[in-house]
């Protein structure tokens, strides 16, 4: 779900060059423009995308020497501002584009919140970018620089983007030279110099910033070189940082990042959820979310773990994940809070562990953050409510005890103690604090002593065994309370885990039973709606276009122009956008692309930018999206595999067809040409009988060719999806007469008999096709039986509404194995009775008959003849509706 991954959009990613300086005024833009002019004079296609408007004549003069890409304007208040036109840069696609002020925050947030995101999109389209940056705008250094200078920097660039730069060029001048430039008014107007010199631009600050810049760039280049040479090294230290809702946690994360960078370690951010339900916990979730996003932007892998206490969860996770160093923030001492709660560091140190613990001191936290931090507010309201619950249960126990005591003053002590123990159990279930159970256990003893032991209504004790009873009672109550709290917590964890497991199981089950991308997206949308309780719209994508919009829960999708732009951007860049992201943050939908390049769909979740997904739901959603993407790719791959198999089958069929037809056409043509050649060359030397034999043989070969071509043309015509056949009423007796005429012409009357018990009956058929089907069946019987085998064409009523046509022979029949294949195209069978002067069938006859009959809503069937032989038959309805099929 990371928004920081670069995507391949069909082009190689462009090269990023950053001109970095330690302060405004060192000459970054001037240096960038000077180098650009040299490249332009060398015929490099280089253009200015955006240069910050300057009061410096030298910089403006350089900018005039380069071609510019037109910028856009936006109105903010009563002022108009220029801003980068990303689409125009991508459209013009120069080799190199110059873009000033990398850390700038866009005034118009219609597309990206930050300029570095604009640059990242341009890089992804294969365009090289040269840009400028001051050291104080690097995310991980901002807190450190704030400590140095006292100036809080709001515009920041994440470290991963700086580390992705191909070239880091330091623009450096001495602090003395910079101060001279400032005094000369070359950086700021002279009326602003007093403020500048009193805050940021002091010699001490500039010297520290210069040193930090040189060291940071050197470290970055060194780190890149080490990564390049040690890329295959698997043994790396593992640095973990504890995430919390504390305002100090931001600086702790940045310090942990620096440590991980220096040690070239695996970096993980770990958040321990202890299932608090109070308002303070809910309010901290937004801060936790921001810290998790910060850790992600610094390259950390984020983990959410559930535990009874933060210390226990951290310790168990660090041991299981082979963490070498755990980074936590310094504990802020508070005597009242520490009296009831063990500080995290003390709790961690009580465990046996092999990892190191490093504490980031509070003095490293910027002064402004300390001042803005809200004071610690103890959980007084919740504690007061729990105290009232304890008092109520105590009163109930006393009232019940007094009633039982009145019934039996001598034997009621045990029962009354049990009532107080039950009160402890109820209190442990009803309240959250362990302290309440502890206090109740002690108070119970004093209440019991006061009301139910002699002398009553005093705290004096006469019997020597009562102190022991009281101690045992206290210990029993405390242990019972502790065990119940533990069981209650385990129940909460189990309930959460069961909810997660059940939700993921339902999700996996729903997508496993789905075999289309559209249905996968719909099922996933309903499951995610159940998780987040937000309306969802599905966009099905094909060939980079939205082909279908499916709103769920009867949700009306009011798509604005900005929504359309965001959708197009997500399709093009294959990254998340909208609410909860920094791209198109103004729209009220969170757009999540599904599937790898190209994406197959988009889930649009209704969300406001102010809303935050808690870490628990975020982890479930991430699992769901990963499973969905995998399922979509599997379905797509399965579809592609099926299409490939069908294509291969078509190619094989086509190849078999060409091979078969070339043989079947070439052989009779060769015979005909040979016979005619003999007649032309040797006609004078041949008798009339010999000439007739050659002519008859040539005629038979021509008939075979005619039948072959007719079958192929008919089959091709019938298989065409837009071909219709014309059904007309036709007398069965006329059909019989035409069959007799064909048999007469083919000299088959002696072998084939036609028996019909149907005469004056109309059937609705395409007569030419049915005649062709019947003749193919007769031809098939002739080819597959011996010359003395009788063949019968039977026409009779199969029922009141159907007439059966059957071709019956007394040949060898067809084996069970071959019966499964006889209607397949190009299947020729054993051809046991073919003679030398007969042509082997092409295997299309029965297939063509079946195709013709399907057009008549009928079906060719086979059954064995008794005692031997074959019967091919089909039925035609007598009342079939006339019309086109």
From Swiss-Prot:
Localization, UniProt: Membrane
Phosphohistidine modifications at: 663
Coiled-coil residue windows: none
Pfam family membership, one: KdpD
Activity regulation annotation text: Cyclic di-AMP is a negative regulator of the Kdp system.
Enzyme Commission number(s) of this protein: 2.7.13.3
Keyword Transferase tagged: yes
GO cellular component terms, A-Z: plasma membrane
InterPro entries referenced in this protein's UniProt entry, alphabetically: GAF-like_dom_sf, HATPase_C_sf, His_kinase_dom, HisK_dim/P_dom, HisK_dim/P_sf, Histidine_kinase_KdpD, KdpD_sf, KdpD_TM
Residues annotated as domain Histidine kinase: 660-880
Alphabetical list of Gene3D superfamilies matching this protein: 1.10.287.130, 3.30.450.40, Backbone structure of the membrane domain of e. Coli histidine kinase receptor kdpd, Histidine kinase-like ATPase, C-terminal domain, P-loop containing nucleotide triphosphate hydrolases
Phenotype upon gene inactivation: Inactivation of kdpD results in decreased transcript level of cap.
Expression induction or repression: By the Agr/RNAIII system.
Catalysis: reaction(s): ATP + protein L-histidine = ADP + protein N-phospho-L-histidine
Transmembrane regions: 384-404, 415-435, 436-456, 464-484
GO MF, one example: phosphorelay sensor kinase activity
Signal peptide: none
Topology of this chain in the membrane: Multi-pass membrane protein
Keyword Signal recorded: no
Function per UniProt: Member of the two-component regulatory system KdpD/KdpE that regulates the transcription of a series of virulence factors through sensing external K(+) concentrations. Also regulates capsular polysaccharide production. May function as a membrane-associated protein kinase that phosphorylates KdpE in response to environmental signals. In turn, KpdE functions as a transcriptional regulator by direct binding to promoter regions of target genes including spa, hla, aur and geh.
This protein's name: Sensor histidine kinase KdpD
């Amino acid at each position: 779900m990371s928004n920081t991954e670069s995507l391949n959009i069909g082009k190689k990613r462009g090269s990023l060059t950053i001109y970095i300086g330690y302060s405004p005024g060192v000459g970054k833009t001037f240096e960038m423009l000077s180098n650009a002019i040299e490249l332009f004079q060398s015929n490099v296609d280089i253009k200015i995308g955006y240069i910050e408007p300057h009061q410096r004549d030298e910089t403006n003069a350089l900018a005039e020497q380069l071609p510019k890409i037109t910028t856009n304007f936006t109105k903010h208040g009563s002022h108009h501002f220029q801003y980068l036109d990303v689409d125009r840069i991508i459209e013009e696609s120069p080799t190199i584009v110059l873009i000033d002020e990398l850390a700038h925050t866009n005034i118009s947030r219609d597309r990206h919140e930050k300029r570095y995101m604009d640059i990242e999109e341009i890089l992804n389209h294969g365009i090289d970018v040269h840009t400028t940056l001051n050291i104080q705008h690097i995310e991980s250094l901002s807190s450190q620089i704030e400590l140095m200078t006292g100036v809080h920097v709001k515009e920041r660039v994440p470290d991963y983007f700086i580390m992705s730069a191909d070239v880091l060029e330091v623009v450096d001048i001495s602090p003395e030279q910079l101060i001279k430039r400032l005094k000369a008014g070359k950086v700021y107007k002279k009326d602003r110099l007093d403020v500048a010199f009193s805050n940021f631009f002091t010699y001490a600050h500039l010297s520290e910033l210069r040193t930090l810049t040189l060291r940071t760039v050197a470290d970055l280049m060194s780190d890149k070189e080490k990564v390049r040479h040690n890329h295959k090294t698997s043994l790396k230290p593992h640095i973990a940082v504890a995430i919390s809702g504390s305002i100090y946690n931001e600086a702790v994360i940045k310090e942990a990042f620096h440590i991980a960078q220096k040690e070239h370690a695996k970096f993980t951010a770990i958040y321990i959820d202890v299932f608090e339900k109070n308002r303070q916990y809910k309010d901290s979730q937004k801060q936790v979310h921001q810290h998790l996003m910060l850790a992600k932007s610094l390259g950390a892998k984020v983990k959410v773990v559930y535990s009874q206490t933060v210390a226990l969860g951290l310790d168990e996770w660090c041991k299981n994940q082979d963490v070498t160093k755990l980074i936590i923030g310094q504990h802020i001492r508070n005597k009242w809070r520490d009296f009831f709660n063990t500080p995290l560091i003390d709790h961690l140190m009580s465990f046996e562990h092999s990892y190191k613990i490093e504490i980031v001191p509070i003095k490293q936290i910027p002064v402004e953050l300390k001042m803005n931090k809200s004071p610690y507010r103890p959980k007084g309201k919740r504690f007061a409510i729990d105290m009232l619950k304890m008092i109520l249960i105590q009163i109930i126990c006393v009232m019940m005890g007094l009633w039982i005591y009145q019934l039996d003053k001598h034997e009621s002590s045990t029962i009354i103690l049990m009532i107080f123990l039950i009160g402890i159990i109820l209190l442990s279930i009803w309240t959250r604090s362990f302290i309440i159970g502890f206090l109740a256990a002690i108070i119970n003893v004093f209440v019991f002593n006061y009301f139910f032991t002699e002398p009553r209504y005093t705290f004096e004790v006469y019997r020597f065994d009562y102190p022991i009873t009281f101690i045992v009672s206290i210990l029993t109550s405390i242990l019972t309370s502790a065990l119940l709290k533990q069981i209650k917590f385990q129940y909460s964890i189990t309930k959460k885990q069961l909810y997660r497991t059940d939700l993921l199981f339902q999700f996996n089950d729903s997508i496993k039973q789905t075999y289309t991308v559209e249905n996968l997206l719909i099922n996933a949308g309903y499951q995610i709606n159940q998780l987040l309780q937000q309306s969802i719209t599905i966009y099905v994508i094909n060939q980079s276009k939205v082909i279908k919009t499916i709103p769920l829960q009867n949700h009306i999708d009011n798509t604005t122009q900005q929504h359309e732009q965001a959708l197009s951007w997500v399709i093009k860049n294959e990254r998340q956008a909208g609410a909860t992201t920094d791209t198109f943050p103004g729209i009220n939908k969170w757009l999540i692309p599904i599937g790898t390049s190209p994406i197959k769909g988009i889930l649009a979740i209704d969300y406001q930018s102010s809303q935050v997904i808690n870490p628990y739901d975020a982890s479930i959603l991430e699992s769901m999206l990963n499973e969905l993407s995998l399922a979509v790719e599997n379905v797509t791959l399965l579809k592609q595999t099926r299409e490939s198999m069908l294509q291969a089958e078509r190619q094989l069929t086509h190849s078999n067809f060409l091979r078969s037809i070339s043989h079947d056409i070439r052989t009779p043509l060769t015979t005909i040409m040979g016979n005619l050649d003999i007649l032309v060359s040797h006609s004078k030397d041949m008798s009339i009988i010999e000439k007739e034999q050659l002519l008859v043989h040539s005629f038979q070969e021509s008939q075979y060719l005619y039948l072959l071509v007719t079958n192929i043309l008919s089959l091709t015509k019938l298989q065409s999806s837009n071909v219709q056949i014309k059904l007309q009423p036709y007398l069965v007796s006329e059909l019989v007469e035409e069959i007799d005429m064909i048999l007469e012409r083919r000299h088959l009357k002696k072998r084939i008999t036609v028996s019909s018990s149907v005469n004056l009956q109309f059937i609705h058929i395409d007569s030419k096709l049915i005649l062709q089907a019947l003749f193919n069946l007769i031809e098939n019987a002739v080819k597959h039986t011996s010359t003395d085998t009788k063949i019968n064409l039977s026409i009779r009523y199969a029922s009141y509404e159907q007439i059966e046509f059957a071709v019956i022979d007394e040949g060898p029949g067809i084996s069970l194995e071959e019966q499964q294949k006889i209607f397949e195209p190009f299947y020729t069978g054993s051809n046991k009775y073919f003679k030398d002067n007969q042509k082997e069938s092409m295997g299309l006859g029965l297939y063509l008959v079946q195709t013709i009959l399907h057009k008549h809503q009928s079906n060719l069937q086979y059954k064995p003849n008794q005692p031997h032989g074959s019967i091919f038959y089909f039925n035609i309805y007598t009342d079939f509706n006339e019309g086109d099929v």
